[in-house]
């Protein structure tokens, strides 16, 4: 059997992996010679993926989007020919990237896909020599996912992000900038901007509104001008809902 490395984060989401590892491992070991590694803290998944990539044909990770991001970031520092295939069993708070891949909603079904599914190419972004999986953003609310306590995420799920974001409404500030693109430029004060390859950001679908292809070599850009009054702010949230 080919070798597979299974990385998992027990603290992701609402701790949904606790007590669920046995059937996941059953699905993986049916097709692979499996090595198991529980993540030990921030940065561990990236380091292990990078350091042990040459030992495995496929790396499967289970956790939130952050866990997957770490694995991909670790692998992207390697030459293309040295990167193993990546599988993902979503077990986080919002699981944005799982929505892009139309992965099954249950752990067991997602494990079956990670074990036996055929690989497909996915575009990975690069920003200041760092890789990003599906979004690079600036401005309002971009630190919500990092500053929302894990305990709150485990208790409230996606609602924890909404509540944490609500505390930032009074501190939204514009970022004056000029953005150049093919054929033109736009100058304004933007309170939020993102370069993305996703149909869902922070659990909000429809951002961006147009269809997104994950392997077309193109990323989407969204810029939000600073709202001038509560009505405009309400319109922004309505567009995201």
What are the residue ranges of the model-derived segments?
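ATP/NTP phosphate-donor binding region
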Residues: 1-62, 69
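Short, glycine/serine-rich, charged loops/turns that create anion-binding
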Residues: 11-12, 93, 197-200, 226-228
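Catalytic phosphate-donor-binding core of small-molecule kinases
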Residues: 34, 165-177, 215-241
